[in-house]
Amino acid sequence: MKNTILILFTAFIALLGFFGMIAEPLADPLADPLPDADPDADPETVIVKAIATLSKKLLR
């Protein structure tokens, strides 16, 4: 019982952190990104590009 409560509490805290990270850009949508930011340095962009490339290869 104690382990179950600990697991649920940990999952709840993780979800709060996840949704908090999502809410940051929504709080200030007009904020400028860093001027010298490299879009390829963003891990999500790299993953999306890799998925797009793989899907193009598979669909040919």
Swiss-Prot record:
Function: The synthetic peptide shows weak antimicrobial activities against a few Gram-positive bacteria (only 2 on the 11 strains tested) and the fungus C.albicans. Does not show activity against all the Gram-negative bacteria tested. Exhibits little hemolytic activity against washed human erythrocytes.
Propeptide feature: residues: 28-45
UniProt superkingdom: Eukaryota
Subcellular location: Secreted
Name under which the protein is recorded: Mastoparan-VT5
Tissues showing expression: Expressed by the venom gland.
UniProt entry keywords in alphabetical sequence: Antibiotic, Antimicrobial, Fungicide, Immunity, Innate immunity, Repeat, Secreted, Signal
Organism field: Vespa tropica (Greater banded hornet)
AXPX repeats: 27-30, 31-34, 37-40, 41-44
Leader sequence segment: 1-27
Keyword match Repeat: yes
